[in-house]
A protein has these predicted regions:
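N-terminal strand-loop element at the rim of the active site
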Residues: 2, 9-15, 28-66, 152-160
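Short amphipathic alpha-helix
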Residues: 18-30, 77
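A short, charged, and often flexible helix/loop element on the N-terminal side
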Residues: 53-79, 122-128
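An aromatic- and histidine-rich active-site surface loop
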Residues: 69-82, 86-115
Length: 175
């Protein structure tokens, strides 16, 4: 049985946004019997913690999945997931700044959905944008596979980094 961990999301049951809905679809909709999922969730977002949801194991990290703590949240989740996974699906790039170090001690298969072009969003200041661009670059460089959720992101990855991204458009119900 293949063991797949999913990190970078607030968690499931979905109560936040798009990545959480995607995870709901991955673990629940036509989920192959030969894949066992573990989803890493923010303990701060789930006061009532389930250990299993839709046949996926849930593991809780005592940090916020959003804001400045998201970087550490993603790194801690990645380290914990390494022990129990064959493949790690990383949703978003904030913790990918750690991948150069991670690759020194692990060759686990990493599939990364880079999401949007976070470094271009107006809500971020200049230092946050630079950090997000660096993390995105590390995500693409160290990923075994990059996922784009739309053609624009797929084209961007090809033009910016010379790497092909797999296109899996949202809703995720066809994953």
């Amino acid at each position: 049985m293949k063991r797949v961990s999913i990190i970078g999301t607030v968690g499931v049951p979905a109560n936040y946004g798009g990545f959480e809905s995607l995870v709901e679809n991955i673990i629940g909709y036509n989920s192959p019997a030969d894949i066992h999922y573990t989803v890493y969730c923010s303990a701060k977002s789930y006061p009532h913690r389930q250990s299993v949801y839709k046949n996926a194991d849930l593991k809780y990290v005592p940090l916020d999945a959003n804001g400045s703590q998201s970087i550490l949240y993603d790194i801690v989740s990645l380290i914990k997931a390494t022990k129990k996974s064959d493949v790690i699906l990383i949703l978003g790039v904030s913790g990918c700044c750690f991948l150069p170090i991670y690759r020194l001690f692990s060759k686990k298969r990493l599939v990364i959905n880079i999401d949007g072009l976070e470094h271009r969003r107006e809500k971020w200041g200049k230092y946050a944008k630079a950090f997000l661009k660096f993390s995105e670059k590390m995500a693409v460089k160290y990923a075994d596979a990059v996922i784009a959720d739309n053609k624009g992101i797929q084209d961007y990855v090809r033009e910016e980094y010379g790497k092909e991204a797999e296109l899996i458009a949202y809703g995720g119900d066809h994953v």
